[in-house]
């Protein structure tokens, strides 16, 4: 199977309620104990880079701020994924952030191989389904000699830099300084303004919005491409439709 087929199958099979039950999301308690880190700290090397990511999540979850979070990274994940505990801790921190009720604007880097991009999106599906994440992407990004990371919340900012191919020699900087957080927030806002929406997630509370969009869309000329988990109802033959209606005891009037 190609990566797109696998991605669509995962999307079709995903059940948010089942996922919430598996990770005990309903039972998660957002800690209220203040997280003590220096006003700012610099991190070096892969092991400290992983620590910086978790420290940012801790600082965000344990602060009183409920401001939205903006995240962008074109840093490779391969080295960090070698540590089996890091992805678990990172996902737990993300779950706590969503449990706190924070909204996340995730700017994806699509300058990756198609397979890697599909794999990345697959890992984000569970969090997308909460409706608290708005995914974006940057157009016209090209291979760059520099790697960057920028994550900003209402209470902390994490900035990272490295040379392509030498992630292990990069530097990450975490700050809680109000002035610096404001600076990084401006940068994140400007980056978000340059990004385009990757997808819209409609949950039950946005049903009216979805219906409005679908009705408006029917009035626009042009080609459509729909990817569905089963054939749409309008492809059914009249004979099969009649048999189904009769089986369910529905008369012509109904």
Where are these regions (language model features)?
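Short, surface-exposed linear patches
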Residues: 91-95, 126-130, 180
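A short, terminal or domain-edge coil/loop segment
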Residues: 121-131, 156-171, 188-202
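Short acidic, S/G/P-rich loop/turn micro-motifs used as interaction or catalytic elements
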Residues: 73-89, 109-118, 141-143, 164
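Surface-exposed beta-strand edges and their flanking turn/coil or helix-capping segments
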Residues: 84, 119, 150, 172-174, ...
